A protein has these predicted regions:
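Conserved beta-alpha-beta core of the PfkB/ribokinase-like small-molecule kinase fold
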Residues: 8-80, 100-101
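Conserved phosphate-binding/catalytic region of the ribokinase-like
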Residues: 22-23, 76-192
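Conserved residues at the C-terminal ends of beta-strands
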Residues: 4, 65, 96
Length: 192
């Protein structure tokens, strides 16, 4: 289950969101948290911090951009964010950085950079959402289970997941629309 943005932190709907997340977790759902925290909510950081921590604790995967972490923690560097802010709550961390390599950190000291395909993007709107979609596609395609996640993913599993995530994100940037093409979707469907 993918959740994120300010909606996942908003105190007004927090009881409903927290209840839904707890229900999903209790029933074995894999929880992927895209922090997606924007500067427009910067003045609310102190108010939402307890909800943020609770989301981090419930998540199996935490993804955010270096911009998110620059706003939230005043540190955009993946290692600093993971070690100081994330790893205590969630062991699987993904930090996207636009055209720069995606940084992954996980249990047992796993740390790897995944270079982005060099291209001239038509638009980057939707790149993060499509990265998330590609990651979830990878979980399904690779048959990654709750047991795999609890045990800790292998480097090969991470590599495959990041290939899928980056393929979706790159495809999205090739056009003015904020989603992958129908043709790309048809090709990906054949991989399932």
């Amino acid at each position: 289950m993918l959740f994120g943005s300010f909606f996942a932190l908003n105190p007004v709907v927090r009881p409903q969101v927290a209840g839904f997340l707890e229900y999903a977790k209790e029933h074995g759902a894999i929880l992927y948290y895209d922090i997606n925290f924007r500067a427009s909510h910067q003045n609310e950081i102190m108010k939402i911090t307890p909800n943020l921590i609770e989301n981090l604790e419930m998540a199996d995967f935490v993804r955010g951009s270096h911009e998110d972490f620059g706003i939230l923690y005043k540190k955009p560097e993946a290692d600093k964010v993971y070690n100081a802010e994330i790893s205590f709550y969630c062991k699987k961390f993904i930090c996207t950085q636009g055209a720069e390599p995606v940084e992954v950190r996980a249990e047992n000291g796993f740390a790897k950079s995944y270079p982005s395909e060099k291209m001239k993007p038509v638009s980057t709107i939707g790149a993060g959402d499509n990265f998330n979609a590609g990651f979830v596609f990878g979980l399904i395609k690779d048959g990654i289970t709750r047991e795999d996640i609890d045990r800790g993913l292998s480097e090969a599993q991470w590599d495959s997941l990041l290939v899928s995530a980056q393929e979706f994100s790159t495809e999205c940037c090739k056009d003015i629309y904020n989603y992958v093409s129908k043709e790309f979707g048809e090709e990906k469907k054949k991989e399932l």
